[in-house]
Amino acid sequence: MAKTLNENGVETEIVSIGVKAMQGCIACNRCRELERCVFQDELYDRIRKQLEDGIDGLIVGSPTYYAGPNGSLCALLDRVFYSSSDLMKYKPAAAVTVCRRGGASATLDRLNKYFTINHMPVVSSQYWNIVHGMLPGDALQDAEGLQTMRMLGKNMAWLLENIAKEKKYPEIESAIRTNFIR
């Protein structure tokens, strides 16, 4: 997908968690005062800086574990999205997942929730943004999955180009926070 984005004039950078353990959000709300998460780590700082520097879009990928995204990724995304929600607005985003057989749609659902609660247009493809494989290199044999990724790259590039032309965003209303009791 990065190749397709690059061919369409979109600069890409891949940020990988790898095997790093991530601190999860503890809902201390200090980020509201500090305008950043209280927990310091290299990946959070790197992503936060990219957001502050004005990245135009975001693609988040994860393997599927027990019908959900990687736990370290969710811990990082919880912190990034909660502490940086104002920097996310109107940035096109897409989720991508890989799985052996099943659980990928639940993984996509979880990842897409980060985007939809932050005023981010979700970029789609010709099918769900999934490739199949179990071992490194297996996904390269998934012709349909690879085509889906190429189309996702083209759709992301198209949306980024059209947003850059217009740059007129809807006015956001102040949030009304309720719960199920009232």
What are these regions (language model features)?
Residues 1-10:
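A short, Lys/Arg-enriched amphipathic alpha-helix followed by its capping loop at the start of a domain
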Residues 6, 116, 150:
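Anion (oxyanion) recognition and catalysis
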Residues 20, 42, 71, 106, ...:
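Conserved active-site and cofactor/substrate-binding residues in soluble primary-metabolism enzymes
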Residues 121-182:
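Glycine-rich phosphate/pyrophosphate-binding loop and the adjoining helix
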